Amino acid sequence: MAEALQELAAHVEMRQPDAILGHRIEFGELTLDVAPNRIVGLVEFLRTDARCRFSSLVDITAVDHPERPARFDMVYHFLSMYQNHRIRLKMQVREDETVASIHSVHPSANWFEREVFDMFGILFTGHPDLRRILTDYGFRGHPMRKDFPTTGYTEVRYDEVQKRVIYEPVKLVQEYRQFDFLSPWEGADYILPGDDKART
């Protein structure tokens, strides 16, 4: 399997040299590092090339790395049922950078890209309907970013008296708790039953 993936990587790198920055095989899957300005052309190639035929878009997501200048990793997963392969495309994107939509190649990317926009705030150029898909209309922020507060900014609840949904600032019933302490189990060297036999 690894040999077939290595051959596939060499084929893609040979046919799309400007798009591929590098590759690796991890967990039985091929990962290609992609130049952001080449994503649409590469996805089109992977879908139509006879040796690839990655016709199924499985998922699009992002990973937040706030400490990096290119804050986000955009991650695309594709499946080729014809070749029985999976492939992962990764590209690094700055916070102020837009990403070209692959909706024209894979119409199923529509809702995946909307979800990435909603959760991470990454903008897609050429998307037909880029608006929130999981959060409410007036939602502030992007909840999958690592700098988003775990409590959120507003509390949404249904009010029985007013017979409608109301929005209120978050009110915590207790103070934040600090869990930064050493566990009694960390660093201990316990002798468990049966360990004494292994040492002799």
Curated annotation (Swiss-Prot):
- Alphabetical list of SUPFAM superfamilies matching this protein: Nqo5-like
In alphabetical order, the GO MF annotations are: NADH dehydrogenase (ubiquinone) activity; NADH:ubiquinone reductase (non-electrogenic) activity; quinone binding
Cellular compartments per GO CC: plasma membrane
Q: How does it sit in the membrane?
A: Peripheral membrane protein
| Keyword list, A-Z | Cell inner membrane, Cell membrane, Membrane, NAD, Quinone, Translocase, Transport, Ubiquinone
Q: Record's family? A: Belongs to the complex I 30 kDa subunit family.
The name of this protein is NADH-quinone oxidoreductase subunit C
Tell me the classification of the organism that encodes this protein: Bacteria, Pseudomonadati, Pseudomonadota, Alphaproteobacteria, Rhodobacterales
